[in-house]
Amino acid sequence: MTELAELAELEIAGFADGHPIANLLLIRRLLEYLRPLNRPIALWPCDPQLVGNGVMREGHDSIVFGLPGIPAIAETTAIAALLECVEEVGTPVHLMRLSTARGVELVRLAKQRGLPITASTTWMHLLLNTASIGSYDPSLRLNPPLGRYADQQALLQAVKDGVVDAIAIDHSPYTYEEKTVAFAEAPPGAIGLQLALPLLWQILVASGQWSALELWAALSTRPALCLSQTPASITPGQAAEMVLFNPHQSWIADSQTLKSRSMNTPWLGQAITGQVIKLWSPIASQETG
């Protein structure tokens, strides 16, 4: 366990662990130590023992594709245990990387009971499901794995309703050599910083399923609130923090247009409508188009 109090004194935004913590005693101790520090903690609910050697969500598609499956209870049992810890200790927790319909339901019920939790899912879990894995594209091997269609629809509705507070990018770059292997041997993850907003807009907003404000709340306003931060605003005389986005700009996702040194995305080589043109932040502004 790191020096939580000393880090809190340095005014860090919060704490997180990119890997699941299977030790419930450690989780309980973390929550107890964090309670007086007034800093959020983000945890990924996942039981590594139930994950085993799985590489995609267990179910019909995993059988058809001949790939070892990961049961949904690898997530939901971990959520249930974590919620019990939160209820006992009272420390606010952000649940990262939700990927199952049952996980959404557990979060919904916990919020109705008044537990101090927030939650997020990733943008790729909103746009894709296990049916996409039939291509065996290694960029579709994610952690947690893509859910079934019912999981995808539950996540979409939960984000729109605010049960799932935020959309995470979970940008995970890998080299060409690391991802140019068989699906089951590839490390899990895909890039997304440059792709998430255009594709979410193209598939959800341009189609009329979501409003622009609903998408922006899930990508910007509510994530800030999950971290106990003040959402960005436009105030005369203050440093700008804005994104200039052209929803009609068409481009091809390739080595010339992607700013990342990694190309591990299932949208590589595809035409995308919508592009971030420029960023403004208190640190610097940057042209991206």
Q: Model features per residue range: what roles?
A:
Residues P145, S211-A212, S255-S260:
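Short, positively charged
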Residues A182-E185, A239-G289:
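C-terminal cap of metal-dependent C-N hydrolases
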Residues T2-I167:
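Histidine/acidic residue-rich metal-binding segments in metalloenzymes
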